């Protein structure tokens, strides 16, 4: 009887594990790794040929596996490249927060997440599925850029350090279905300093996600802090 009982438990555990594995079989992860992605990294970070020169008119990317795509927003007509906003590919890492808290180092993150490449969002930007399909994006890893984190931590003479109660810098992720999610990069003196995985499954099936940033320190032109962040390891539910 005991042998039968333990066998039953083992079988149940086996079925449970199999179920979990099968559920993960339809997950594709966008990591931005490979030569085709590295070719999209501009040098120098600001004023380079891909994001500001001849390449700015055609700069964009589409992941072959997930169909997720991004690029420059061309919000003002496209003449100013990445300065108008967008999603650029990067591999720059530097933790020199005070020296590199400037737009000339706009594609850097302060710490590696173990991979080579990642994406950097500036200003209001959108990623979408190129095929126009609806898919669930389960999660992604996000991180402040070195520029953003440096200004949040030390200020820069224009924007204040976000080290006090009431200070905040928040990312809002808006799905095309109308659902939204807020993620704090700074809140009441607590500042995100490294990579963080965020669960996006509550947004449901989406065609696109739009990223916007806002904060407590503002002028008549809007938030004073640099609106940059990085993301990586985007988990997407694919069709079974």
Say what each PLM segment does.
Residues 1-5, 14-39, 238-240:
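Bacterial Sec-dependent N-terminal signal peptides
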Residues 170-240:
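Terminal, low-complexity interaction segments
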Residues 26-126, 132:
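N-terminal targeting leaders for non-cytosolic proteins
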């Amino acid at each position: 009887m005991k042998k039968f009982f333990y066998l039953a438990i083992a079988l149940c555990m086996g079925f449970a594990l199999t179920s979990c594995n099968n559920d993960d079989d339809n997950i594709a992860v966008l990591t931005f790794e490979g030569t085709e992605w590295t070719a999209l990294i501009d040098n120098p970070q600001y004023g380079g040929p891909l994001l500001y020169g001849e390449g700015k008119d055609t700069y964009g990317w589409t992941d072959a596996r997930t169909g997720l795509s991004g690029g420059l927003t061309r919000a003002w007509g496209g003449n100013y490249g990445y300065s108008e906003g967008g999603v650029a590919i990067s591999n720059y890492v530097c933790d020199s927060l005070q020296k590199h808290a400037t737009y000339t180092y706009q594609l850097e993150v302060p710490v590696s997440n173990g991979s080579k490449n990642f994406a950097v969002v500036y200003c209001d930007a959108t990623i979408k599925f190129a095929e126009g399909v609806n898919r669930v994006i389960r999660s992604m890893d996000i991180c402040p850029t070195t520029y953003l984190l440096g200004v949040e931590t030390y200020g820069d003479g224009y924007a204040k350090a976000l080290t006090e109660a009431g200070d905040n810098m928040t990312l809002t992720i808006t799905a095309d279905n109308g659902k939204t999610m807020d993620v704090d990069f700074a809140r009441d003196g607590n500042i995100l300093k490294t990579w963080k995985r965020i669960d996006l499954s509550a947004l449901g099936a989406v065609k696109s996600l739009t990223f916007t940033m806002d904060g407590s320190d503002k002028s008549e032109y809007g938030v004073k802090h640099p609106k940059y962040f990085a993301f990586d390891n985007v988990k997407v539910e694919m069709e079974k």
